[in-house]
């Protein structure tokens, strides 16, 4: 099937005033794309400290303006200091994610130290993974939130917080189902967190589409995202996305027209920049570099590049949506 021109879907939406159909691509040169960035894992051997500046230089060169990382650096102050300084130098916005392991005191100290550079803190990563123990996990997130809130109030820094959830299959009714019969997906997790005292400002969302998700499944999952944004009157940081075909063995990111990995990523970027651009504030592709030593086999191949010198063809797609040649 021929690839769609990247501006057709948005033209239809603007001219007709209705929703863009799932089969249409998007992007008009005279209109901005949703800001695009990447995820990085600075604890992994694929991300050595010696190449930290090269990574930030590459992001700047490709107009990838945000970098979701830091979860493994948050307690390594010298390394985080360096990352923050480099991000400032190359005009990259850091989007650190705090795991549930930090204490309130640690979160307070972090937020206070970096208040001038890090204005939005994401608290928790995919903590909606199970209903079992959710209350305990949420209580830890609330403690972290309170530490950040106290630092912000003391400094009058205006710091914001983000809560994270994943897409959820409402047709799954098995013993480990997270949202059985509930098309709103992980809304239950947001509701519980809000009730427990986590007064989050933004929501971050994770969904990795298969090419065959176009239509019903993609509408289901992105519909969950929209419902969350509307209920809580906020914006979405879509900060983990790539093709789901990688879970099934794709290692090279695919090629244009493959009706598989490459086309999956192009399709979701098209949809987000079309029907969902009103609620999605930022997108981060998972991830910048392959991690060949990762203990989980499929986690080795999510990179847009094999390494800093060898981009995959899919990087050209990402550069296009980032607005670079």
Task: Indicate where each model-derived feature is located.
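Bacterial N-terminal signal peptides
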Residues: 6-15
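Short, well-ordered coil/turn segments that N-cap beta-strands
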Residues: 31-36, 63-65, 90-94, 116-119, ...
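Aromatic-rich peripheral "rim/lid" segments of glycoside hydrolase catalytic domains that contact
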Residues: 43, 248-260, 264-267, 272-325
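Catalytic domains of carbohydrate-active enzymes, especially glycoside hydrolases
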Residues: 50-75, 95
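Noncatalytic carbohydrate-binding groove/subsite architecture in carbohydrate-active enzymes
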Residues: 97, 138-260, 297, 301-308
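Active-site groove signature of glycoside hydrolases
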Residues: 109-138, 162-170, 201-211, 238, ...
């Amino acid at each position: 099937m021929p690839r769609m021109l990247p501006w057709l879907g948005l033209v239809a939406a603007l001219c007709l005033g209705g929703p863009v159909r799932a089969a249409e691509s998007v992007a008009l040169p005279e209109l901005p794309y949703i800001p695009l960035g990447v995820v990085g894992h600075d604890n992994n051997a694929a991300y050595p400290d010696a190449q930290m500046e090269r990574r930030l230089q590459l992001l700047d060169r490709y107009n990838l303006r945000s970098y979701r990382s830091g979860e493994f650096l948050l307690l390594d102050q010298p390394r985080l200091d360096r990352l923050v300084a480099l991000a400032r130098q190359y005009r990259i916005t850091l989007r650190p994610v705090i795991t549930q392991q930090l204490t309130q005191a640690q979160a307070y100290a972090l937020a206070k130290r970096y208040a001038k550079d890090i204005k939005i803190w994401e608290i928790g990563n995919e903590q909606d993974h199970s209903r079992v123990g959710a209350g305990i996990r949420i209580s830890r997130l609330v403690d972290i939130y309170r530490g950040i809130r106290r630092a912000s109030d003391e400094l009058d820094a205006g710091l914001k917080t983000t809560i994270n959830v994943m897409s959820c299959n409402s047709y799954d009714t098995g013993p480990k189902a997270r949202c059985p019969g509930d098309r709103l997906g992980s809304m239950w997790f947001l509701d519980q967190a809000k009730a427990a005292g986590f007064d989050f400002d933004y929501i971050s969302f994770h969904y990795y589409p298969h090419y065959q998700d176009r239509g019903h499944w993609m509408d289901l999952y992105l519909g969950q995202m929209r419902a969350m944004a509307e209920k809580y009157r906020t914006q979405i940081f879509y900060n983990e996305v790539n093709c789901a075909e990688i879970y099934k063995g794709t290692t090279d990111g695919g090629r244009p027209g493959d009706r598989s990995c490459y086309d999956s990523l192009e399709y979701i970027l098209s949809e987000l920049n079309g029907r969902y651009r009103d609620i999605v504030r930022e997108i981060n592709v998972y991830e910048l570099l392959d991690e060949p030593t990762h203990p989980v086999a499929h986690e080795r191949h999510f990179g847009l590049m094999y390494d800093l010198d060898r981009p995959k063809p899919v990087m050209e797609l990402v550069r296009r949506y980032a607005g670079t040649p």
